[in-house]
Design a protein with these regions (language model features):
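N-terminal signal-anchor/start-transfer transmembrane helix
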Residues: 8-25, 221
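Alpha-helical multi-pass transmembrane bundles of energy-transducing inner-membrane proteins
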Residues: 111-118, 122-205
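Small-residue packing motifs within transmembrane alpha-helices
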Residues: 9-13, 28, 32-35, 39-42, ...
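Structural signature of hydrophobic alpha-helical transmembrane segments
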Residues: 1-12, 76-85, 132-145, 202-218
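Alpha-helical transmembrane segments of multipass membrane proteins
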Residues: 16, 20, 39-42, 92, ...
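Juxtamembrane/interfacial segments at transmembrane-helix boundaries in multi-pass membrane proteins
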Residues: 51-69, 174-227
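Helix-loop junctions at the membrane interface of multi-pass solute transporters
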Residues: 18-22, 94-108, 147-156, 182, ...
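Transmembrane helix-loop-helix hairpins at membrane boundaries of multipass inner-membrane proteins
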Residues: 1-5, 19-114, 189-197
């Protein structure tokens, strides 16, 4: 497919998020919901054509110095996860329709809806990325909207919870960064299609596995590294 459907699906919530954060009240709710529903329609379309064999891959040179690519793609698993994301976000927005009416909230309805849309875009990038470095950057970028969502609409100790979440996640991200660098150095590429041909058996494979496992265990979070 020549049309960059995955890029559009990922960027549309960002555009919607920026616009929604400038609005308040009913206008913010309506705008956020419209963008989430349009993203839902495009996500369902991408899922249908993707699982029926259409090639949705997008590959462009990105950071030449390190051999990184702006590469997106979709197989049965990643498209299913993207479909789940685009379905869940409108449900979340409906469930929190009156979030701005809560006197305990720190920011407006537009801020909540905008952050939720931005988080949706980053999640879609994570599931569509076929370049390890691109995945890492999008995965870590989710910390930004997550931090503000927790700090703005969390429980009574939300400030402390948000900071604790951020610090734990950054620690896990640092471990993952070393693993990502190791993959790039050993594999000579960050593209999954190239890395699939590389032999990661032996000590290097075990070390990289441990690095990614620790990072994802913290992100999950899994016992005993949960907060």
């Amino acid at each position: 497919m020549s049309f960059p459907i995955l890029t559009v699906i990922a960027l549309l919530p960002f555009v919607g998020g920026v616009i929604t954060m400038m609005l308040r009240g009913a206008a913010a709710r309506a705008t956020g919901m419209v963008f989430s529903l349009v993203t839902l329609v495009l996500g369902v379309y991408a899922f249908i054509v993707g699982v029926n064999g259409t090639n949705l891959s997008e590959t462009h040179r990105w950071i030449r110095a390190v051999g990184a690519w702006y590469a997106l793609g979709g197989d049965g698993l990643s498209l299913t996860m993207i479909l789940l994301v685009v379905i869940l976000v409108p449900v979340v927005l409906l469930a929190e329709w009156h979030v701005g009416d809560d006197e305990t909230a720190r920011w407006s309805t537009g801020a909540f809806f905008g952050l939720a849309l931005m988080l949706e875009g980053l999640a879609i990038y994570c599931f569509a990325a076929t370049d390890v470095l691109l995945f890492y950057l999008m995965f870590e970028a989710t910390l930004i909207p997550m931090y503000f969502l927790i700090a703005g609409w969390g429980g009574p100790r939300r400030g402390r919870a948000a900071m604790k979440f951020l610090l734990y996640s950054l620690a896990g991200g640092l471990v993952m960064l070393f693993a990502v660098i190791g993959v790039g150095v050993h594999g000579g590429s960050f593209l999954l299609s190239d890395l699939a041909k590389v032999d990661f058996s032996g000590t290097i494979g075990k070390e990289l596995f441990v690095g990614f496992f620790i990072a994802f265990a913290i992100k999950a979070p899994m016992v005993p590294v949960h907060t």
